[in-house]
Design a protein with these regions (language model features):
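Thiamine diphosphate
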Residues: 1-158
Length: 158
């Protein structure tokens, strides 16, 4: 599994200028590595606010990444819809999918993995899935999927 320093290095290498986020128990482990990076992490209070901040950064010429957990993605739906479909902005989202590994193993009871997948499809967001715990997990390749033209989401298994 990639460590936080490898993840932050891959974010920088992918060309992101800012990480707009609400750290959760998984994504929050990146915080010490972010402190020493050229990324400018911006903590927000709500996930819809994260999308609004990212919109401002995009309009100002920056290349932000919004990182949030799946339940926060659900909360931010209208802001995502507005950014991607009304404003036609190349919004990039890293969505932590709580309970994804347990669901894959058939032991999970959390419905977040089920609805996260359905919601990115409902919003017509091109997306990829990534599980950092897999043996051949390549965080740089996973994050490279977010560098393609247009809006993109990466469903990050937790």
């Amino acid at each position: 599994m990639p460590n936080p320093n490898e993840i932050v290095s891959a974010l920088v290498a992918a060309g992101f200028t800012h990480l707009v986020w609400i750290p959760d128990s998984h994504l929050g482990t990146w915080e010490p590595a972010l402190a020493d990076s050229p990324l400018a992490p911006i903590r927000v209070c709500r996930e819809g606010e994260a999308v609004g901040v990212a919109i401002g950064l995009l309009l100002g010429g920056a290349n932000p990444l919004v990182a949030l957990q799946c339940t926060g993605f659900f909360e931010a739906g209208d802001a995502v819809r507005n950014a991607v479909h009304d404003m036609k902005l190349p919004l990039k989202l890293l969505i932590g999918v709580r309970g994804a590994r347990a669901a894959k193993a058939g032991t999970g009871r959390d419905n977040c993995p089920h609805f996260a997948q359905k919601l990115v499809e409902a919003w017509e967001l091109p997306h990829a899935q990534f599980d950092p715990a897999e043996a051949n997990a390549d965080v740089s390749a996973a994050l490279a999927t977010l560098t393609q033209v247009g809006p993109r989401a990466l469903l990050w298994s937790e």
